[in-house]
Curated annotation (Swiss-Prot):
Polyubiquitinated. Ubiquitination by AMFR and deubiquitination by USP13 may regulate the interaction between the BAG6/BAT3 complex and SGTA and therefore may regulate client proteins fate. Keywords: Cytoplasm, Isopeptide bond, Nucleus, Phosphoprotein, Transport, Ubl conjugation. SUPFAM superfamilies: Ubiquitin-like. The keyword Protein biosynthesis does not apply. It is found in: Cytoplasm, Cytosol; Nucleus. Component of the BAG6/BAT3 complex, at least composed of BAG6, UBL4A and GET4/TRC35. Interacts with BAG6; the interaction is direct and required for UBL4A protein stability. Interacts with USP13; may be indirect via BAG6. Its main location: cytoplasm. The keyword Ubl conjugation applies. This is Ubiquitin-like protein 4A. GO terms for biological process: post-translational protein targeting to endoplasmic reticulum membrane; tail-anchored membrane protein insertion into ER membrane. The gene is UBL4A. Disulfide bonds: none annotated. Residues 1-76 form the Ubiquitin-like domain.
Amino acid sequence: MQLTVKALQGRECNLQVPEDEQVSTLKQLVSEKLNVPVRQQRLLFKGKALADGKRLSDYSIGPNSKLNLVVKPLEKVLLAEGTARRLADSPPPPVWHLISKVLARHFSAADASRVLEQLQRDYERSLSRLTLDDIERLASRFLHPEGTEAMEKGLSK
């Protein structure tokens, strides 16, 4: 099938690909035609970003479809890759190590491990549920503790 890939800067190319082609393969073809490195590409179809591991058919992309190409700045790509690498290489936070020591004093090794895993899951779930308002409130309390103390005293009267 014939596809048109249009970059936001105005350049575009036409590509002939099978309907079940991998998005990652399409990105490689775009790289060859438009000289945009694969890692800087973000392909969009009807406003939705295409994932590398999926096929064009997963997004119902048919013949003569038009895809948009967003070119990510190299600095952002390198920063994101560096951050991901640091996170993967970093040891668990010291707090989890301390908690595991405390649990080891009160539970068997197997039970302590299960309790720690459940605690970490609960913690991650709680963090993922925080709204921007919640985060803003927490930040305000840390940045202006005297203001929140006054508000809490006023509310408790």
